[in-house]
């Protein structure tokens, strides 16, 4: 488990390129036949990926000491979106088939969660966010047909994109975790511009569907102290509540957003005009 401490905005603005990457970038999300796990002190979110190829993968009791529990989801809820080939997630003996872009919410208290790929030639890639939970909501599969899609932006401003809301109150109940998938239309490059902050939630972006020769310049920092982190395919970035979170790519791309914090009101945000950015 890679533990990331909270960081003050006054400290963050003094960091150089490598310093910013050390604090906020999750460089390697998927490793064959293993789980990756980054624990952020910011709202206690856990972020990672699971890519089973030759064997099943589960998070065992080895994380118990670091989380102060006897099993992973004893006091946590889990959200998973599969960006790879078809796979299965077995929760306490109940098997769910999770295809490409299917998702699974797993409620607090699930003791055994086992991940597998159906075809080792095209393995599943399970990207997950995990957050503290105060009660148990039912485990539920969510397919792309069940999400709440919203199309925003315009080709003229190069920010036309479709936001697919997987784990939001309109789709299912969670304690605090919200997740969704945003896909840019071909030829569009900007996400979340004009940008915003939200004091009551933090957010993690996971960028994917990018060619090897492409990148995204992820914008972060306070609106008057912006910085950037160069992102490549299948990398994630942590965004504190005080930071904007936006990006521009060399080509169109897709990203998964996950939020935890005080509320789940999607529109509870503080908008920043482009003219006010520095």
Swiss-Prot record:
The gene is kduI. Keywords: Isomerase, Metal-binding, Zinc. It catalyses: 5-dehydro-4-deoxy-D-glucuronate = 3-deoxy-D-glycero-2,5-hexodiulosonate. Disulfide bonds: none annotated. Binds 1 zinc ion per subunit. The bound metal seen in the crystal structure was tentatively identified as zinc, and its requirement for activity has not been shown. It comes from Escherichia coli (strain K12). This is 4-deoxy-L-threo-5-hexosulose-uronate ketol-isomerase. HAMAP family: KduI (MF_00687). One of its GO terms (molecular function) is identical protein binding.
